[in-house]
Amino acid sequence: MTPDPSDCLAPTAFVDFDHPAVAGYARESAGGPGTDRERAVRLYYAVRDGIRYDPYLIDLSTKGLRASTVLENGRGWCVNKAVLLAAVCRAAGIPACMGYADVKNHLSTERLRQTMQTDVFYYHGYTSIFLDGRGVKATPAFNLSLCEKFRLRPLEFDGTEDSIYHPFDL
């Protein structure tokens, strides 16, 4: 079920784009004038590369899942980063909401598999951004420096095609 885009513009307990730090980050990262698509792409890369992926920092409290907390921490896991992307898009007037999927993570480390006791990531978070009359999926989880370290092809986002699952590797 696809939500009505107009329902994806308000702040929530998690998507707290009305927080001054989140609003400021959105203004800086959107890069000024441009189409919604151009600004959404800039916001995607700001979150993907400006917030470090950290699957060990999991705080499921309301405060721990807020976009403002993710921004304050400077790191987070897929759900955190997707929440922040939804928040900065909404702050820029671009409708965005959360999406979730169960994914088999072929990229995880032995330490992470032992911690989770599985290689299936339940409730993997991504952001659906409403552009040009439709939702486009974006996963800002793995930052560029992480991808380079593990020799993974980073997910690119152009605002026209879904960017949701990583290929195996380079």
Task: Tell where the protein language model's regions lie, with residue ranges.
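Secondary-structure boundary elements
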Residues: 2-73
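A generic structural micro-environment signature
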Residues: 23, 28, 57-59, 76-77, ...
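Residue-level signal for well-ordered alpha-helical scaffold segments within enzymatic catalytic domains
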Residues: 45-49, 87, 91, 129
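His-Asp-centered catalytic microenvironments across diverse enzyme cores
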Residues: 2-5, 9-17, 103-170
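Active-site neighborhood of thiol-dependent amide/isopeptide-bond enzymes
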Residues: 55-123
